[in-house]
A protein has these predicted regions:
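A short acidic, Gly/Pro-enriched loop at the edge of an enzyme's catalytic core
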Residues: 122-134
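Conserved class I S-adenosyl-L-methionine
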Residues: 2, 8-66, 80-84, 102-105, 162-191, ...
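Short alpha-helix
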Residues: 192-214
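Class I SAM-dependent methyltransferase SAM/SAH-binding core
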Residues: 72-74, 78-123
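A short SAM/SAH-binding and catalytic strip from SAM-dependent methyltransferases
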Residues: 133-146
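Conserved Class I S-adenosyl-L-methionine
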Residues: 78, 212-254
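A short glycine-rich, Lys/Arg-flanked "PGG" loop and its adjoining helix->strand segment in the class I
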Residues: 147-159
């Protein structure tokens, strides 16, 4: 679902789309994952978000042909990736998320009505072995038990299925980057952690997935206008110096 979009610029100043200038002290309210995404849902798709833009730019070329395939978008939020996969020719698909507000926002999109359902990532309402392709974007940082997540993904995917995960890169997290948003002129931060590539790989390997590849893209020129439009152009060269997103491609070996 998800989209980390808060970038650290010091102990109190953060990039959050249209937040206060970096020189100003920003008061950030901390909210639970469920409450946070319910608040964010109304503006999630229209808020400029450099990490979502980077993730989409980096992940799209990695996805296989989905013509005639069955796809799942787990932690789908507003159905951002499910809509793309269905438009690319997937035979059938479904999106699951725990945020009812995010799902309502997704249902307003053309082509997604009837494809979205409320569910926990660790207890998906899908039968055994239904998916040729599964994507789970910007959600791992909200999940403590990656081994249970990988087992559940193994349950719902077919032999040889492809699984793609994306999340905030651990180096960004170490620099203070967090998941945040603006709501009614206030800044909010959602609790998140960052799993290393080794941790993610170990969890998925335990359920029979092989790591096909991992990439660690950095913010680059295509994302610069988002910073400039938000009045944060002076931050861009600093944040582009480290990997921003961790993208993993796994394949079921059974």
């Amino acid at each position: 679902m998800r989209g980390a979009r808060t970038v650290e610029t010091g102990s109190t100043s953060r990039f959050q789309g249209q937040s206060a200038p970096p020189s100003a002290s920003v008061t950030v309210g901390r909210v639970s994952v469920t409450h946070g995404y319910d608040l964010w849902a109304a503006t999630y798709d229209r808020d400029p978000n450099p990490l979502l833009a980077l993730e989409e730019r980096a992940l799209q070329p990695l996805l296989p042909d989905v013509q005639g395939k069955q796809v799942l978008d787990v932690a789908c939020g507003t159905g951002r990736w499910l809509a793309r996969l269905l438009a690319a020719g997937a035979r059938s698909g479904a999106g699951a998320d725990f945020s009812s507000a995010m799902l309502r926002a997704g249902l307003s999109k053309a082509g997604l009505r009837g494809y979205l359902t409320g569910a926990d990532c660790l207890a998906l309402p899908f039968q055994f072995g239904v998916a040729d392709l599964l994507v789970c974007c910007f959600a791992l940082g909200h999940i403590g038990d990656l081994f249970s997540l990988a087992r559940e993904f193994g349950r719902v995917t077919k032999p040889g299925a492809d699984v793609f995960t994306t999340d905030l890169h651990p180096q960004g997290y170490a620099r203070g980057w967090r998941t945040g948003f603006r709501y009614r002129s206030e800044s909010f931060e959602i609790g998140v952690s960052a799993h290393s590539l080794r941790e993610v790989h170990k969890a998925f390997a335990s359920s029979g997935f092989e790591l096909v590849r991992s990439i660690e893209p950095r913010l680059d020129e295509p994302e610069r206008p988002i910073f400039e439009q938000a009045g944060r152009g002076n931050l861009f060269n600093r944040v582009r110096a480290i990997p921003a997103v961790l993208i993993c491609h796994f394949r079921a070996t059974w």
